[in-house]
Amino acid sequence: MSGYFQKRMLKYPLYGLIAATIILSVITFFFSWWLSALVVVGGIILTVAMFYFEYRLNEDVQLYVSNLTYRIKRSEEEALVEMPMGILLYDEHYKIEWVNPFMSKYFDKAELIGESLEEVGPEFLDVITGNDEKGIMSIAWRDHRFDTIVKRKERILYLYDRTEYYDLNKKFQANKSVFAVIFLDNYDEWAQGMDDRRRSALNNLVTSMLTNWAREHRIYLKRISTDRFMAFLTEEMLKRLEEEKFQILDRIRERTSKQNIPLTLSIGIGYKEDDLIQLADLAQSSLDLALGRGGDQVVIKQPEGKVRFYGGKTNPMEKRTRVRARVISQALQELITQSDQVFVMGHRYPDMDVIGSSLGVMRIAEMNDRNAYVVVEPGKMSPDVKRLMNEIEEYPNVIKNIVTPQVALENITEKSLLVVVDTHKPSMVINKELLDSATNVVVVDHHRRSEEFVGSPVLVYIEPYASSTAELITELFEYQPDLEQVGKIEATALLSGIVVDTKNFTLRTGSRTFDAASYLRSLGADTILVQQFLKEDITTFTQRSRLVESLEIYHDGMAIATGHEDEEFGTVIAAQAADTMLSMEGVQASFVITLRPDKLIGISARSLGQINVQVIMEKLGGGGHLSNAATQLKDVTIAEAEKQLISAIDAYWKGET
């Protein structure tokens, strides 16, 4: 600093002053020697003055810089000791060399020098030895949250205590809004047959139970119609409700059942959305999904993330009406007449229900003067379906309208109508490309609705209370024009679908099922032919026997059978094996794991109704009904699939979804 002043402020001005003094004294000497002497004296005085002031200035600057340097060093020392940031120095063996006072208060030990990080703070050691080069990392340690920065070359760890921020953020998240819509599934049906006194008593009972439940959990509840409530709560309240598995479902069902009025609830919940309108839309969408799955359950949705389900463990009561069947039939008729042609497609490896309902839709299209085509893959059929297809070959007017996916893709247009039967999952249809090519799509299914669904269908007819899709299609005939009578082969195929899905009218069979079967019989359905379709050969029998032979009981009547890793089994054989196992004493639910012809691992699940196998299969990406469900797994072995199944069963018994 002094060199700077000497160089820039003393050296050159002083030289200039001396030179000017000499020149001026020489010039004035020729005129007057005393004037020249005066100039010399003045120059000397100025030079001395400049030296003096320059010296004082330099001293003042030196003093200022010295004081400033001292203050900076002092502040650095105080910062290391007093600032609210932890500093930890460690050696090459990850032992503590020094910590500042701020950080030392977090440790239990008074003397930390020489202590191993692995013992006093293994979380810190993980940060130091980790490969993360992103800079700031967050860790949890002793009820605190720290943001950390590691300087590995200098062996320094900086820690910022963010516990207060995280606690505040956690509190903010816990208090975010949650919107719920509560629906009394079958309130109207029960209320219609009651007198005013009983209806009022039922209404008071349900309202009182829901109000007490809401008050218990600090939920705002408001009744908006006779069978609908809305509720506002927070995410913290929602978490508590999930922990208790929404016991209000069981309470309402059990309490009303004692009065011979088994009322059930469906609850749709939306959360993780700041916009209240979108939050309400999420809740309504969740409720629609809950009702589509049969009711008596809770569905929780967020904008991003997996949908969660609770309840739905009881067999749903039949709620569909003739009025709905008529409305759907008329809507389907209108869509058919507006199209140029109709294509019908079911799920891969179609069963009798798919073929029967497809032929039924084809006949409905012909009743409305439109050509219809059933899409199948000839090489991917079970033996019973092959026998049905062989019989159809005797009917030229029918067989000519059965086409492959390639033919359908070549002929489908923007005005064509595609009807998807017996499934609502895009991943399960015979040909995904055909589904994507269709502008107008109708879905008719009897499986409980899952999260995966056909995008933007123009008409949806899903009735999980029906025995089969064939039953639903049969009911639509009554409201169609009589231009074309239902033929014997269509009626027989539809009856076959009902027989297969109900296991000869023993499972999921309601009064409407018998009505549909009776109607089909009146149209000429051949029951003897149905039995011929369902006959099995010796190979099928022996394969099924081998599967049943591998049966093992896992948990409270849960029977599991597995095929060999390299032996392929058709889906029908696996399903039949599951049915056979279910007929054995002590078996409440059966699961058959096999290698399918498409190289996927398939799991067929059956139950007597006390155990909801659909919930178990949904945990593995599948679905179905309470007593009849299945799934397919990719890139796993049979042994690995069995482990996944056992985990899903364990989660089911724990009440997890």
UniProtKB/Swiss-Prot annotation:
Spans through the membrane: 13-35, 37-53
Region annotation DHH: where it falls in the sequence: 342-498
Gene3D superfamilies reported for this sequence: 3.10.310.30, inorganic pyrophosphatase (n-terminal core) (3.90.1640.10), PAS domain (3.30.450.20)
Subcellular localization(s) per the UniProt record: Cell membrane
Amino-acid positions noted as binding Mn(2+) 1 in the UniProt annotation, renumbered to this chain: 347, 351, 422
GO molecular function: cyclic-di-AMP phosphodiesterase activity; hydrolase activity; metal ion binding; nucleic acid binding
Chain segments carrying region PAS-like: 74-137
EC number: 3.1.4.59
Keyword terms: Cell membrane, Heme, Hydrolase, Iron, Manganese, Membrane, Metal-binding, Transmembrane, Transmembrane helix
Presence of keyword Heme: yes
Cofactor binding note of this UniProt entry: Binds 1 heme (probably heme b) per subunit. Binds 2 Mn(2+) per subunit.
Recorded GO CC terms: plasma membrane
Residues the entry annotates as binding Mn(2+) 2: 353, 422, 446, 501
Domain comment in the entry: Has a GGDEF domain (residues 175-303) preceded by a PAS-like domain (residues 74-137) which together may have ATPase activity. This is followed by a region with a DHH (342-498) and a DHHA1 (592-645) domain which together have c-di-AMP phosphodiesterase activity. The PAS-like domain is important for heme b-binding.
Function statement: Has phosphodiesterase (PDE) activity against cyclic-di-AMP (c-di-AMP). Overexpression decreases export of c-di-AMP, leads to slightly increased susceptibility to the antibiotic cefuroxime and somewhat slower growth in macrophages. There are at least 2 PDEs for c-di-AMP in this bacteria (this one and pgpH); this may be the major PDE for intracellular growth in host macrophages. During host infection c-di-AMP is secreted into the host cytoplasm which leads to interferon-beta production and secretion by the host.
Name the UniProt record assigns to this protein: Cyclic-di-AMP phosphodiesterase PdeA
Species assigned in the record: Listeria monocytogenes serotype 1/2a (strain 10403S)
Gene, per the UniProt record: pdeA
